[in-house]
Amino acid sequence: MIDKLQAIEDRYVDLSQKISDPNIISNVAEWRKYVKEHAAIEDIVLKYREYKKVLEDIEATKELLSSNDEELKEMAEEELSQLEEKKEKLLEEIKILLIPKDPNDEKNVIMEIRAGAGGEEAALFAHDLFRMYSMYAEKKGWKVEIMSSNETDIGGFKEVILNISGKGSYSRLKYESGVHRVQRVPTTEAGGRIHTSTATVAVLPEVEEVDVEINPNDIKIDVFRSGGHGGQSVNTTDSAVRVTHIPTGIVVTCQDERSQIQNRERALKILRAKLYEMALQEQQREIAETRKSQVGTGERSERIRTYNFPQGRVTDHRIGLTLYRLQEVLDGDLDEIIDALILNDQAEKLKNMNLN
């Protein structure tokens, strides 16, 4: 690991010279590339330099242990203990910094919430999840925009697609993808029996046009009149848009906006995110095949989290975390769960990294 860190520091020194070179500064594209790389490794280099300074201090303090002055010797032993502790802490921090960054972590989010098994109760649960993520986004200072929705007559969602934008939105919300399960007594249940329903959450990184190129010949665009609840007409013009990506068969429908142009833009934005996610999954599937023996199949668990209303309990099955604060979680208090998932993810990645 030390060799790797030294190589990173050498590169950092080289980049520092490059970004100060007038010949390189005159080439804006090249200069920006070097500045970006310099910034990406700066935290590791500063932490490594701090680590090297602690090693020097340890060696200097060890020399004091041979002193005949008992008081000085005692102080040196105490100092050495603190330095060793600091060294171990810095090593752990450096290991975390060495974990390869997810290139999508800086992106915004397209989140799809769909009612699963459970009929109307599942649709109401999908609405609860929509509210939970909206409140979490508000706490984080992120912006939430409904891109598309399909509501039920009693206030549930068969499907809702959100655009969540703000610093750290994808890096934190990506852990929410999967099947969410609710256990509760529906308001319509006269016998008071507990029902189990599910909703699925998909978290996609929002991608720019430059990230995914869509060939105009590969898409079919249909326009139609948007409808309200129960099929009632809410618009007298053909403003709703259905985009079909012919090679993959992906269909995206948007009808929330009154303008056909806005609905078309939203539908294409969602399509780009879906195509990007598909390419990403294929890439990850190939990587997973080579690591299958070490880390399992790489497939997502069918059920990632359970929300149990009678017990006021939330359990995340991936990490075995249980909290008895159901209402707070549903009100957007998700940080404790997400922080634990991030730590678990980092631990798994460290386990599979070769730091020698």
From Swiss-Prot:
Matches recorded under Gene3D superfamilies: 3.30.160.20, 3.30.70.1660, 6.10.140.1950
Segments forming a coiled coil: none
Modifications after synthesis and translation: Methylated by PrmC. Methylation increases the termination efficiency of RF1.
Location in the cell: Cytoplasm
Role noted for this protein: Peptide chain release factor 1 directs the termination of translation in response to the peptide chain termination codons UAG and UAA.
HAMAP family, A to Z: Rel_fac_1
Family membership noted in the UniProt record: Belongs to the prokaryotic/mitochondrial release factor family.
Designated name of the protein: Peptide chain release factor 1
